[in-house]
From Swiss-Prot:
UniProt source species: Bos taurus
Domain of life: Eukaryota
Biased composition (Gly residues): 7-19
Presence of the UniProt keyword Cytoplasm in the record: no
Protein name per its UniProtKB record: RUN domain-containing protein 3B
Encoding gene per record: RUNDC3B
Region (Disordered): 1-20, 232-258
Entry-linked SMART domains: RUN (SM00593)
Composition bias, Polar residues: 240-250
Length: 423
């Protein structure tokens, strides 16, 4: 009997250990899921708030996000002396005081970040380590969160630290968020914060490492009443109303909506900010439209002026072309007249040499007639400047003498022939 009772006691102890282990696993899963979900909501509220105002230390959305991220990075962080030996093996100075029994001051996620993020190019680890007014490890971790957000490299830091799985295993226990599947979701969530311009002051009480970070869950809680609960509330309202008058029954009376005054004030403030932003955008667009209309009118006026100049230049070119064509025709006519006069003068000179003096007088008469004709022909005023070389006396004499020499060759032979000898 005693052995049986002892065996039953041992079995109950074994069953209790299994229940405790399953309960611990369930609690760890709930913690991870809660922190990741709240972190996602916090990032969304930060992005929404950044559309209306600058995010700084006074923003409640940022303070809540910083507390959530600190809780995530501190989830199941080891406190054993093995991590201390690992840090001393890497020749990394320990944060806080080290006693004969191990690590003195409480650990924080900064001890993990400064080891796992050493491979990030142009990291801020050394600058944060050298801060004079930031002494504790937790305060340096909070300063690192702010600097990484201002540098828009927080997602890069977290991704680099999570890829160093060996270092992560050294610092965190099983069931930690950074060791689970939620770690990849965390890096993706933080990537959206690169679009926000943060402005922080690293000298203040907000970096005090003595006070732990507390998450405010109220902004992310929303109660949705089920349909069964709504119907039961309606029945209860009907029952309460029937005490006054059994005939009066409310028609589908819904549950009363109770809104907090602060939530209404915040919504009104957001709507007002959106309205002001819309008005500013409208004014900017109206000014831009007016500027573009002025530029368009100026361009149209310049286009008209250029078209008028093109038409004037085309007309001037046409007139000049017609004038040049007329001058060419006049030059051709004068050239033909000069050629006919040269031919007549050559014939007259030939006839003078071949005929007797009486006939030469007739030739002189013909020459006088030709001279009178040439004198009677008036020069065109438009050709005086262009034909100066043709109207000069020297050129005219040289031209006539040249042509007369050409024509004198054949008549001399005719004069020596017997048929042309004078009787």
């Amino acid at each position: 009997m005693a052995s049986r009772s002892l065996g039953g006691l041992g079995g109950s102890r074994g069953g209790g250990g299994g229940v405790k282990k399953s309960l611990s696993a369930r609690n760890a899963a709930v913690e991870r899921r809660n922190l990741i979900t709240v972190c996602r909501f916090s990032v969304k509220t930060l992005i929404d708030r950044s559309c209306f105002e600058t995010i700084d230390d006074s923003s409640p959305e940022f303070n809540n996000f910083a507390a959530i991220l600190e809780q995530i990075l501190s989830h199941r962080l080891k406190e054993s002396s093995q991590s201390c030996r690992w840090l001393s093996h890497l020749q990394i100075p320990l944060q806080g005081q080290v006693t004969w029994f191990g690590y003195g001051s409480p650990r924080s996620f900064w001890d993990y970040i400064r080891v796992a993020c050493r491979k990030v190019s142009q990291n801020c680890i050394c600058s944060i380590e050298n801060m004079e007014h930031v002494s504790s490890s937790r305060a340096k971790g909070r300063a690192w969160i702010r600097v990484a957000l201002m540098e828009k490299h927080l997602s890069e830091y977290i991704s680099t630290a999570l890829r160093d799985f060996k270092t992560t295993r050294r610092f965190y226990e099983d069931g930690a968020i950074v060791l689970g599947e939620e770690a990849n979701m965390l890096a993706g969530m933080l990537l959206g914060l690169n679009a926000i311009d943060f402005s922080f002051c690293l000298k203040g009480e907000r970096l005090d490492g003595n006070l732990p970070a507390v998450i405010d869950y109220i902004p992310y809680l929303r109660f949705t009443q089920s349909s069964d609960s709504i119907s039961s509330d309606e029945e209860e309202l009907r029952t309460l109303g029937s005490s006054d008058s059994e005939s009066s029954t409310p028609e589908k009376a819904g549950p009363p909506v109770i809104m907090d005054e602060n939530s209404w004030f915040n919504k009104c403030k957001r709507v007002k900010q959106k309205y002001q932003l819309t008005l500013e955008q409208k004014g900017y667009l109206e000014e831009l439209l007016q500027l573009r209309e002025n530029q368009l009118s100026e361009s149209v006026a310049q286009n008209k002026i250029l078209l008028q100049r093109i038409e004037d230049s085309d007309l001037a070119h046409k007139l000049e072309k017609e004038q040049l064509e007329y001058i060419i025709v006049e030059l051709q006519d004068q050239l033909k007249s000069y050629q006919s006069l040269d031919q007549l003068s050559a014939e007259v000179s030939l006839s003078q040499t071949s005929l007797d003096p009486g006939q030469s007088q007739e030739g002189d008469g013909k020459q006088d007639t030709l001279n009178l004709i040439s004198e009677g022909k008036e020069d065109t005023p438009s050709l005086l400047g262009l034909c100066g070389s043709l109207t000069s006396v020297a050129s005219y004499k040289s031209l006539t003498s040249l042509k007369s020499n050409d024509y004198l060759a054949s008549p001399t032979t005719e004069m020596t022939s017997p048929g042309l000898t004078p009787s």
